[in-house]
């Protein structure tokens, strides 16, 4: 049997995959990934698709839906309605919700997708790369692998992502190793927050939050 990947399929990190909305021809391939979850960044959830519902039930795959607008081009045959045009198709809350879900190593293997595997997924992945200290050049180069160009609004969206994300009900030891090498935690002996940096090759480094670069996002764990 020939295995066909979804359009724009790629591995983001071990056991985390990205691509477009799965079609019937892609299901044998997705089955080989032994997925636990499918994360959909689409207008409608997979639960509205009988084919995908059956596939997920047969393979014990749970689905998560974060509603996003369609990436398809507007239908020029329809009458134009004057409204404020969004500069990018998602808000930062979509990225935050994705990070909160993907930080838990218990949610892997996971396939995340938008409608066509291009802009929305690329924006989310680009923002998440900042947790791994990717350079801006590397982030934008990866973005351009899946998109023919990047406009100023999309670039600003990526570069200005510096949210402090509250993480509840997850122990630090249960986070995936590739996301967040820098996190904020409240210590048991002090009332002030401290910034801690994970370093696999050295002892834990500690610095005050005031010294943190404002250009980087941070995670704040409450279960420590």
From Swiss-Prot:
Pfam families: Y_phosphatase2. Keywords: Cytoplasm, Hydrolase, Phosphoprotein, Protein phosphatase. Coiled coil: none annotated. GO terms for cellular component: cytoplasm. InterPro entries: Prot-tyrosine_phosphatase-like, Siw14-like, TYR_PHOSPHATASE_DUAL_dom. The keyword Phosphoprotein applies. This is Putative tyrosine-protein phosphatase OCA6.
């Amino acid at each position: 049997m020939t295995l066909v990947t979804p359009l724009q399929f790629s591995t983001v990190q071990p056991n985390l995959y990205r691509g477009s909305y799965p079609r019937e021809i892609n299901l044998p391939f997705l089955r080989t990934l032994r997925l636990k979850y499918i994360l959909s960044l689409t207008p409608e959830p997979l639960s509205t698709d009988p084919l995908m519902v059956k596939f997920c039930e047969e393979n014990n795959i749970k689905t998560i839906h974060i509603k996003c607008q369609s990436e398809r081009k507007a239908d020029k045959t329809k009458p134009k309605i004057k409204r404020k045009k969004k500069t990018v198709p998602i808000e930062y809350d979509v990225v935050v919700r994705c990070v909160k879900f993907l930080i838990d190593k218990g949610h892997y293997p996971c396939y995340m997708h938008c409608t066509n595997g291009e802009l929305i997924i690329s924006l989310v992945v680009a923002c998440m790369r900042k947790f791994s200290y990717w350079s801006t050049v590397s982030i934008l180069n990866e973005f351009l692998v899946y998109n023919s160009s990047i406009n100023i609004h999309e670039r600003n969206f990526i570069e200005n992502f510096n949210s402090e994300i509250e993480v509840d009900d997850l122990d630090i030891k249960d986070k995936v190793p590739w996301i967040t090498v820098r996190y904020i935690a409240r210590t048991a002996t002090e009332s002030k927050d401290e910034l801690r940096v994970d370093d696999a090759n050295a002892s834990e480094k500690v610095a005050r939050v005031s010294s943190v670069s404002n250009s980087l996002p941070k995670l704040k764990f409450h279960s420590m």
